[in-house]
């Protein structure tokens, strides 16, 4: 009897200790965490592209050349970050490319026609851009139509308005120059200036790009909104069932894309003083491809802001690397398609490996 009673506590202690041992066994190693990162495939691809052009293109490794690569990457990356967040949330925006042009046209024509300070036009452009983004999100959540249809309609409307209003107001397909208007110099300093570091000139868009990457990563990884984005993209019905504000999340994501389009549009305007109303068509696909190369799933619920930045960097290295290698630039789209296929396959393999190790 005594032996039986004394064995009882030991048995309980052994049972209690068992889960502790299991938890130690199930701890994720740093390698497994690395394999689970969405941007792993794009980082491998970026390193391969960098080494490739470093070997075959004379001058690719020069500081001035790398500055050019970063600038080309930033013009795509500014839009790729919010587009990636939208794709993680399970949606697309086919109007993103022409919205960049729309925001530039609004700033230019409002300032010129109203003889207002350039910053007034910039502010009006921001409000209108955000309203267009909110419209996309509102129509999506209220009609339940696919985002492809909603944003394709917005794309066509913006294309028509860009051309129609520009011809109606300015009489041509381009805006009047606003270089001599009040506030232009300070606005150019914010959106299109050049910063010299160690004798090498870098465009300010690189800083905008890095800031958006940092902001996007913080939202996804450190905030409740980031959890909502992943939840909505993974399973919208399940997210709604646990109290996630699905409609507000999607409207906010579309407004985020509109904000990125506004920044890109102001850079376009203040870089050239005037805007061609037909620009931007087709760029929406480039932003989506950069996000996919960076690890975003077409179906949503998976991806990262850093991955989209790496995808944009691959674009920049390829577009400028072909020039430095003195190849025919017509080959760029071939490389673009090949990178998309390879990156998609590599990202799918990385995701399967990540799922297998968890």
Regions found by a protein language model. Give the residues of each.
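Single transmembrane alpha-helix segments in multi-pass membrane proteins
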Residues: 49-114, 138-144, 291-306, 338
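Hydrophobic core segments of alpha-helical transmembrane domains in multi-pass membrane transport
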Residues: 42-54, 83, 158-163, 208-218, ...
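Alpha-helical transmembrane segments within multi-pass membrane transporters and channels
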Residues: 115-156, 310-311
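Transmembrane helix-bundle core of multi-pass membrane transporters
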Residues: 148-223, 249-252, 271-280, 355-358
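Cytosolic-side transmembrane-helix boundaries in multi-pass membrane proteins
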Residues: 1-51, 55, 234, 241-248, ...
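Loop-to-transmembrane alpha-helix initiation sites
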Residues: 147-149, 203-208, 250, 282-284, ...
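Transmembrane alpha-helical segments in multi-pass inner-membrane proteins
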Residues: 261-262, 271-337
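Helix-loop-helix "hairpin" substructures at the membrane interface of multi-pass membrane proteins
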Residues: 117-126, 130-136, 197-275
């Amino acid at each position: 009897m005594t032996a039986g009673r004394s064995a009882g506590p030991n048995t309980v202690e052994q049972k209690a200790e068992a889960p502790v041992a299991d938890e130690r066994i199930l701890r994720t190693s740093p390698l497994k965490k690395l394999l689970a990162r969405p941007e792993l495939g794009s980082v491998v691809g970026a390193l391969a592209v960098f080494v490739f052009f470093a070997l075959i293109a004379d001058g690719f490794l020069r500081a001035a050349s790398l500055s050019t690569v970063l600038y080309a990457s930033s013009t795509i990356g500014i839009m790729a970050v919010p587009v990636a967040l939208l794709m993680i949330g399970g949606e697309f925006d086919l109007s993103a490319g022409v919205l960049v042009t729309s925001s530039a046209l609004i700033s230019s024509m409002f300032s010129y026609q109203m003889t207002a300070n350039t910053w007034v036009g910039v502010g009006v452009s921001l409000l209108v851009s955000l309203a267009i983004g909110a419209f996309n999100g509102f129509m999506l959540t209220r009609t339940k139509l696919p985002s492809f249809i909603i944003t394709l309609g917005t794309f066509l409307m913006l294309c028509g308005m860009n051309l129609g209003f520009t011809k109606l107001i300015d009489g041509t397909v381009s805006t009047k120059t606003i270089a001599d208007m009040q506030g232009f110099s300070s606005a150019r300093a914010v959106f299109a200036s050049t910063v010299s570091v160690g004798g090498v000139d870098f465009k300010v868009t690189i800083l905008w790009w890095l800031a958006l990457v940092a902001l996007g990563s913080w939202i996804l990884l450190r905030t409740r909104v980031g959890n909502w984005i992943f939840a909505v993209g993974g399973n919208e019905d399940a997210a709604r069932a646990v109290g996630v504000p699905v409609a507000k999340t999607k409207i906010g994501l579309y407004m985020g894309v509109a904000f990125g389009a506004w920044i890109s549009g102001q850079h376009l305007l203040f870089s050239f003083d005037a805007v061609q109303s037909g620009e931007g068509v087709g760029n929406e696909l480039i932003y989506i491809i950069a996000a996919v190369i960076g690890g975003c799933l077409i179906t949503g619920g998976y991806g990262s802001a850093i991955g989209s930045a790496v995808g944009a960097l691959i674009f920049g290295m390829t577009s400028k690397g072909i020039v430095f290698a003195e190849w025919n630039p017509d080959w760029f789209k071939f490389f673009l398609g090949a990178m998309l296929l390879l990156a998609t396959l590599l990202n799918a393999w990385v995701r399967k490996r990540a799922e297998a190790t968890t």
